[in-house]
Amino acid sequence: MKREAICFTAEEILNRGKNDIPEELLSGRNLVYSSPATLAYNSPGAEGFGVKRAGLSVPESIMLIVAPGCCGRNTSLISSMPEYKNRFFYLEMSEPDLVTGRHLNKIPDAIKEVLEFLRDNGKKIPKVVMICITCVDALLGTDMDRVCRKAEEALIGGEFDGIKVRPCYMYALTREGRRPPMVHVRQTIYSLLEPMEKDARSVNIIGGFAPLENTELKEYLTLAGIRNIRQISTCGTYEEFLKMASANFNIVIDPEARAAAEDMNKRLNIPYIELTRVYSSGKISSQYKALASVAGIDIDDSAEKAEADEAVARLKNAYPDLKINVGECTNANAFELALSLTRMGFKVGEIYATLAPENYVYVKNLALLSPDTKIYCNMEPTMLYYKISQSDANVTIGKDAKFYCPYIPNVAWNQDTRPFGYQGIRDLMDKIFESMKEAKA
């Protein structure tokens, strides 16, 4: 057996076709190697906005984590953040619980105990209790909707009457399924909204858990007469969050929120339009034209598009032969980003990402422009043999790419606040420029 990391060029994948993507690049087909490069994203409850932080994005909510001790330990770092103080609580499962499932009968009493603790210590009583469970209950076949319903019914008639109880599934083993954890948690969050009279000048931006900042999208909506632009991250109270049900339409900025948007369309009669995060100014312009047409508003994006193109030109002029490696632990689709960078005139040497069939179209177009670009899968066991000195790239994008190329300038590009639209292109180009400038100093 060769001790080298398996990779395929974009041209090789193009020649094989969409229906014959190498199994080494697909998730769930082989043994999984938990590369240290991706530990931050491997667990749905780990770093960044995983299930736990996402669940607590609902204002005035707390979380009861029902799990064996080993599953809850990665919450310690999150719970140390000031904004999460007195919001995480634990119901530890014993070994008999793992076999019998008797821990489920303890949940109503555990919730009451937590609420009494908050009351007795002068803390604010929450409006929502999120129950976070792990793969253990997935294997037990636990009906968490029923468990939460019974827990909520147990509060009726008492001092905590009216508090909502909802499930959060920290099921790492369902990440490749129909409803991965981050899809389900978004559905859970917005299921709390109740029908409300519509406001023609209100819009929701859903998908992210940190507010969109310095993005032209909000400016366009404001200029079009939209008075209320709501994001869950900017709702200070539960009552303010509930007003999201009055929106005239939703703007979905993350595919993982699509199922939640469809639920809201059926249940609350709120239609939605999806704006994909891309790094092609041409595609961004097309999306804004579609938004303007659907929403019946005027959008003039010529100035912002010119600024984004200028940022690209500045980097290109300063580093005309720039070669970039792209990882998947970024605020981007690694394959779309690689294609966009190539179209900008940069070279993409390597991509570290799992190739899902829906991303084949990016690789297909990439192969026509950069056939020799190598594609590795972070989860492939042979990544153990990746030689950190083999790449001749000038800069890398993504936390995982930095692991593989530690001696090359890196732009992590995985901040909580997600870049979007032309602002995303400008900021990324500026970050790469600064990184290269610092490396040359």
Task: Set out the residue ranges of the language-model regions.
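An N-terminal assembly and electron-transfer interface module characteristic of large anaerobic redox
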Residues: 1-441
